[in-house]
C-alpha cells in the first residue's frame, strides 16, 4: 500500500459534483414518510401527495408536551432492584416503576388518568391543489439540497429550503393555478380522539396559517404565503415559536434567494466532510442521501435530533413519544458525525445532555447512593426527564456510558480539549463512579450482579436481566479506557479505581457458543439488538490478538449468523453490516446493507423500524414507523467499509468486496483527527493524509 502525505487539506469537489440525485414516483400517498425530506435542524418538511394534491407535512424538533414523566425515586435503588430480581418479583418491579399522576396533568372527561409521559406533538400540514394538473415524479439533488416535482404535462415545481432564513420555498410555474390550505394537527381526528382530553385547545387561524397555544409549553405557529414573481408564484412555508420573525420581506427574497442559500449551505457541508465513490449505485445512494438527511436533521444551530429528527407526522403522535433513546438509537443517529468529519453537528446533543447533570446526579444518588455520579435512563425527553414504562431499559447504565464514550470520541476526532475540560471529563467520571458502585467482588474479580442486555426478554424479570451482561462489561471497559486516555490528554494521573476495573472486570461473559448475553443466557434466537457483540463494535474492547479470545469471537459470530435475521428491526441491520466488516467478511457487509435498502425502506426511501417488504424479518407489521437511526447507521456502515479501526489499527477498504474494482473516499476522518483520501484500483491501494490531528495516529495497514 502506498501512503502519501499532503501538506494541506485538499477539498476535492469532484465527488460532490457527482452526488446522487434521488428520485420519487408519484403518487406518494401511503404516509408522509414517503415524501421528499427537507430540514434545517429545527423545522422539517415532507413533500408528498398524489393526483392534483401536494402535501407539505411540517414538524418541529422542539415541539414537546412536557407534562408528565417519571423522576427517579428513592425506592428505585440498585439494592432494591437486585432484591426483587432475585425473588423474581415481577409485580414488585412493576409497582416500583409505576407512579401516581402528578397534579399538573388535569385531563377532563377522559380515562387518561393513568401513568403518562412527555411526548412530541404533531404540528400541521400545508396542502396545495394544482388546478387539474397531476403529479408524476419528484427528485432531490443531494449535492445542493434542491428538489423538484414534475407534472404529467412536463411542467416543474421547484423546491428549496434555506437554513439562513428558516424558510421553505416552492416555486410554481406561470399559468398553474394553485390553492393553498394550512391545516393544524387539531383539525385531524387525533384532536377529538386524544388531544382535547389532554387539555389541548384547537389552534387559532390567522391570515397565513395558525398559532397553537399549548397547555404548559410555548405556543407554536405554522405559516404559508403565496408571493407572485415574474415567472410564476412562490409558496413560502415557515414555523415559529419564540424565534425572531422569519424573513418578513419574503417578496424581495424570491425563490432564487432561497435556492442560492441552499446551494451555499450544502456546498459547505459536503466540502467539510467525507465523500465516497463506489461502483454499487444502491450503496452510493445510501451514503449520499443518508448523509444529506443526517446533515439536515443535526444542524449545529438546530435542535438535538430524536428518533425522527424534525420529520414528524402531522395527524398522529409519533412512535415511542419521539424520545431520545440512548441504548443505541441516538448513537446511531449521530454516528455519521465522526468518520464523516461533521463534528460540530454533535454539539446540540452534547450541550443538552450536559445541561441535565443536576437531574442525572440526583438519579445516581437514588440509584446507587453516591453524590458524584450520573445516571441517564435509556428513554428521556429534551429535559432529561425519564419516559417510563420499561424498567429494564431505565436501569441500563450502558446508556450513560455510551454517551460518555460519544463525548470522548468527539474529543479524539476533533481535538477539542476545552470541551473535555468543560464538561465531558466530569460526565465520564460520573458515569464510571456509578458503574463501580454497581460492582461487587466475586471470586477475586469484579462483577455486575444485575444488568440488562438491551431489549432481550423485554420486561420479563426471569429473562431480561442477569449477572455480567456482555454489553455492560464492554461499555464499562470502553469508558475506563477513555478515562485513562482523557486523563493523559489532560496531564492527570489516571484514577487507580479505573485501572482496577480494567484489570479485574471480565471483558465478556463466555459460554459454549461464544459470548453470552449474561451469565447463563446464551444467544439462542434471532434478536434485533446485537448487544452481546458490542465489544467488537461499537466499543472495540475485545483483544483480537489473543488467540483464545479470537476463537471466542469466531464462535460468537458463527452462532449469531446461524440464528439469522428473522427478528431484526431496521436500525440493527447496518450495525450487522459493520460487524460483518469487522470480522473481515466484506461481501456479507455489502449484501446486508443492500438488504436494509430492499426491506426497510418504503417506496419513498423512508427509513423504517419494521420491514416494509416480507421475507427477511417477521418484524413487519407496522410499515409506517419511520426512524432515522437506520438511515444514519447505514451512512456510517458505508464509511466503515472504507476505513475500520480495530484495537488501535486502521484497515482501509476492509469492508469493500474484491468485485469493486475501483472505489475511493475523500476527507475521511480517523480517530486521531487525521483526514485521509484513499483509492483502491484493481487491488492497488493508495492513501493520502490531507489533514492532521493532535493525538497519536492509529497504526495503518
What is each residue range found by the language model?
Residues 152-167, 186, 404-434:
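A conserved hydrophobic secondary-structure block that centers on an alpha-helix together
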Residues 167-174, 476, 676-679, 685-692:
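Short, well-ordered beta-strand segments enriched in hydrophobic/aromatic residues
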Residues 3-14:
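Sec-dependent N-terminal signal peptides
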Residues 53, 67, 73-75, 326-362, ...:
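Active-site core of glycosidic bond-cleaving carbohydrate-active enzymes
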Residues 102-131, 625-671, 675:
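Catalytic cores of secreted or luminal carbohydrate-active enzymes
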Residues 18-323, 342-347, 353-362, 491, ...:
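Acidic/polar, glycine-enriched structural segments that form the non-catalytic walls/loops
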Residues 105, 294-303, 319-321, 345, ...:
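Secretory-pathway/luminal and periplasmic proteins that interact with or process carbohydrate-rich
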